[in-house]
Amino acid sequence: MKGLRLAVIAGTSEATDLIATLPEQDSVTAFAATEYGKTILEGQHCMVRVGRLDADGFRFALRGMDAVIDASHPFAQVVTETVRQVCAELELPYFRLGRQKITKCV
């Protein structure tokens, strides 16, 4: 059975956990902004692309993907908005993996 071609915008431990749960037949490309992000993804069944991309870079890199899962850090709002916009242009399914808000208890 042929799997999906998935792009994961990494940058959190949730991205690593997500990739670990994806079926082996899926072809996963993880996008990490830094070399440190790449080291966190070592040992996962994915290809890792390192470096910050602008909208044109994502337009090129995401062509041919079946879906994009944005598991970037909550503070990485620029990459989230850029990827969301590019996915809309390419009519590519976009999913945001979010974190639950933690409220400080006093």
Residue ranges and their predicted role:
Residues 17-18, 39-40, 57, 78-82:
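Phosphate- and divalent-cation-binding pockets in alpha/beta enzyme and binding domains
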Residues 59-106:
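Glycine/small-residue-rich loop that forms an oxyanion/phosphate-binding "nest" at active or ligand-binding sites
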Residues 7-45:
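N-terminal glycine-rich anion-binding loop in soluble enzyme alpha/beta folds
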Residues 11-14, 52-54, 73-77:
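Short beta->alpha connector loops
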